[in-house]
From Swiss-Prot:
One of its GO terms (cellular component) is plasma membrane. Belongs to the PlsY family. InterPro entries: G3P_acylTferase_PlsY. It comes from Bacillus cereus (strain ATCC 14579 / DSM 31 / CCUG 7414 / JCM 2152 / NBRC 15305 / NCIMB 9373 / NCTC 2599 / NRRL B-3711). One of its GO terms (molecular function) is acyl-phosphate glycerol-3-phosphate acyltransferase activity. Coiled coil: none annotated. It is an enzyme of class 2 (transferase). It is found in: Cell membrane. The chain crosses the membrane at residues 4-24, 71-91, 113-133, 147-167. It is a multi-pass membrane protein. Keywords: Cell membrane, Lipid biosynthesis, Lipid metabolism, Membrane, Phospholipid biosynthesis, Phospholipid metabolism, Transferase, Transmembrane, Transmembrane helix. The keyword Cell membrane applies. Signal peptide: none annotated. This is Glycerol-3-phosphate acyltransferase 2.
């Protein structure tokens, strides 16, 4: 039982690692919280620091979700891995290492899915990028993909999967509430795929 509690803490701490902040400060000498949207996630990193930093942060945020979700398998615990994934996402959104001001749960949630259901992860990746290249709204693509994740979990019939996806989708949509207003008002920034970035 003690091991279980410790691993939940480890999962939260993994999620709390603010890779956007680390990359910004070490690689570029800036605090990304003071630039762009101020969000500690991949999208703000792409827009503020460029493609190289953006890809680095996004991949790192995905992998911390994957690693956290795999903890019970690594240590042979008979506990559903999605609970550890949820702990990592909570850490990503409310990181203890960055004054509880983190990202919007998208990349780390993707990492959780990558570990738990690679097939669903692949389907959602197609949905996300199709929406992104069609609408050019990262936020809208993220929210719609989160809803599709809930639908996929319902189809699976896995009760814990359904609960986890509902919680993650709720978190993603809640963290994008300001984006929803900007989309309605047509002031939400669009992804610019032709713009030259670092």
């Amino acid at each position: 039982m003690v091991t279980t509690y410790l691993l939940f803490i480890v999962a939260y701490l993994l999620g709390s690692i603010p890779f956007a902040l680390v990359v910004g400060k070490i690689g570029y000498g800036i605090d990304i919280r003071e630039h762009g949207s101020g969000n500690l996630g991949g999208t703000n990193t792409f827009r503020t620091l460029g493609k190289k930093a953006g890809f680095t942060v996004t991949i790192a945020d995905i992998l911390k979700g994957t690693l956290a979700t795999s903890l019970p398998m690594i240590f042979g615990l008979d506990i559903h891995p999605l609970w550890f994934g949820l702990a990592a996402v909570l850490g990503h959104v409310y990181p203890i290492f960055a004054k509880f001001r983190g990202g919007k749960a998208v990349a780390t949630s993707a990492g959780v899915l990558l570990c738990y259901s690679p097939v669903v992860f692949a389907i959602l990746a197609v949905v996300f990028f199709t929406l992104l290249f069609t609408t050019r709204y990262v936020s809208l693509s993220s929210m719609v993909t989160a809803v599709v994740a809930v639908i996929a979990s319902i189809v699976s019939g896995d009760k814990i999967f359904i609960i986890a996806m509902c919680l993650l989708a709720g978190m993603v949509i809640y963290k994008h509430r300001a984006n929803i207003g900007r989309i309605i008002n047509k002031t939400e920034p669009k992804a610019n795929f032709s713009k030259k970035q670092k």
